[in-house]
UniProtKB/Swiss-Prot annotation:
SMART domains reported for this sequence: HTH_LACI
Pfam families for the chain: LacI, Peripla_BP_3
Gene: rbsR
Keywords on record: DNA-binding, Repressor, Transcription, Transcription regulation
Residue ranges flagged as DNA-binding region: 4-23
Single GO MF descriptor: DNA-binding transcription factor activity
This protein's name: Ribose operon repressor
Boundaries of every HTH lacI-type domain copy: 1-56
Organism whose genome encodes this protein: Pasteurella multocida (strain Pm70)
Function in brief: Transcriptional repressor for the ribose rbsDACBK operon.
Transmembrane region(s): none
The organism's place on the tree of life at top rank: Bacteria
Entry-linked InterPro entries: HTH_LacI, LacI/GalR-like_sensor, Lambda_DNA-bd_dom_sf, Peripla_BP_I
Amino acid sequence: MATMKDIARIAKVSTSTVSHVINNSRFVSDEIRDKVMHVVKELNYTPSALARSLKVKETKTIGLLVTATNNPFFTEVVSGVEQYCHQHHYNLILSNTEGDTERLRHNLQTLIQKQVDGLLLMCSDARIQIGKDLNVNLPFVVMDWWPTEEKADKIYENSEYGGYLATKQLIEKGHQHIAIITGNLKKSLAQNRLDGYKKALKEANIPLREDCIIESHFDFEGGKRGMEKVLALQPRPTAVFACSDSIAFGAYQTVWHQGLHIPQDISIIGYDNITLAEYMSPPLTTINQPKAELGKLAVETLLQRIKNPTAKHRTLLLEPQLVWRESVRQLYQEKRG
């Protein structure tokens, strides 16, 4: 493991200069700072746990890494996290990775340099281990499906059950030709919801149509493009499970552009229950993710980890619930052809 002495030797500066650059504790010229930080990156250096423990006091600051802050779901979760940080007299530094691994690495280093007391992670598309691959010795909590992370506190939403619940509700309303618009299936979150969809169809003895599985992205544009493919299917599905409310909103626009109506021509159920869902026309039936509970549990779990870093790691599972509105119509049961 690299040390400050190693960095100083390679950068040809003093150890104290390296310390000032890393801790941002004194003015250092841009030329020397760039040279030191280049070596820091090359050696994948992060301050050791021992060095951090020698701080006089905590900074009362938490770092939050998210995949995308322009997604309404993440925005609402971040708001909840900030609220609970404030209640515990902690500051929050938000960092957006945009799904870029190099940006994730860079932003992590920035947060470490700011001496945050711990990290909250919402980067489900990451394929690296924070503790192992990036040599991070900070307390951290994973707030979503981060499949490669083993030794961490984790708070998951039961996505497979949520996908099952959404599909089952459509089936109970008489729908048998049901399409699904997923996010990127390389993400565990998207795959889990698809697994729930398949489980509900199998349980109801409804044949799986592979052409009804539309892989897209968890955003408005993904919903628009995904719904265009759904409406081109023959026979056309009577209902769609949109794997996020953002996907559902994009799907709404495509339906409107094609002169169709929800739910008369096609039913839609979303996932997340973001604030805008109830203001759509018609109001969106969706699966509620307990966003406030997620934010509260994440902050409380991280603060416990900061106080007791050697405690056994915990995994908490939150259960989604159906929120019934007006975007799904009741169909008469029909024999499948």
